[in-house]
């Protein structure tokens, strides 16, 4: 019965049995073949002149255009891994690296808020400048008016002072007090100048009753060239 099915035909004929296939090696070979097929589809194949890897036979579900892909609305779409899968991977990576929508909205709101704050600060600065300029002009105007009023009041006070009785005596007393104050100040080299202030050097003065021209000339010379000690 076994002979009828031919199970032991190879052993009886003396031919060596085929070695058992390694599952790990077969899996690695299949993966390398698939990777090579993807690279060839995306344009990353070997350069011209090199031997391309043999294409893996696909499932034979039909003949003609059915082996190449699926036709939808007159367009043929590739069912195997091709450029569409590569673009999808890139789009997925972009979605992963893209900022979340909440953070993007927060950044946009912060940018608009900073722009509004900058514009408001510029407007406020301009208003402060105009206000400061106006205040300075008003202060200068008030100061000028106050100075003019002080001048007028001083003139009126001086006129009233000299019109009051005994104004000469009051003025003489004030001059005497100023002279005493200056005389108490000890400044080297001004002694004869202080002495000359006590004399009347007007030759037409009616108060003089004696000839003091000689003494006057001596005092003038001492005032101009004091004696050296």
UniProtKB/Swiss-Prot annotation:
Region annotated Disordered, chain positions: 1-82
Region (Involved in binding clathrin heavy chain): 93-155
Modified residues (Phosphothreonine): 187
Membrane-related topology note: Peripheral membrane protein
Cysteine pairs bridged by disulfides in the record: 199-209
Compositionally biased region (Polar residues): 58-73
Major localization class: membrane
Matches recorded under InterPro entries: Clathrin_L-chain (IPR000996)
Pfam families: Clathrin_lg_ch (PF01086)
Record's compositionally biased regions (Low complexity): 1-17
Localization annotation: Cytoplasmic vesicle membrane; Membrane, Coated pit
GO terms for cellular component: ciliary membrane; clathrin coat; clathrin coat of coated pit; clathrin coat of trans-Golgi network vesicle; clathrin vesicle coat; clathrin-coated endocytic vesicle; cytosol; intracellular membrane-bounded organelle
GO BP annotations, alphabetical order: clathrin-dependent endocytosis; intracellular protein transport; synaptic vesicle endocytosis
Self-association state and partner proteins as the record states: Clathrin coats are formed from molecules containing 3 heavy chains and 3 light chains. Interacts (via N-terminus) with HIP1. Interacts with HIP1R.
UniProt family annotation: Belongs to the clathrin light chain family.
Task performed by this protein: Clathrin is the major protein of the polyhedral coat of coated pits and vesicles.
Protein name, entry field: Clathrin light chain B
Source organism per UniProt: Homo sapiens
Taxon lineage: Eukaryota, Metazoa, Chordata, Craniata, Vertebrata
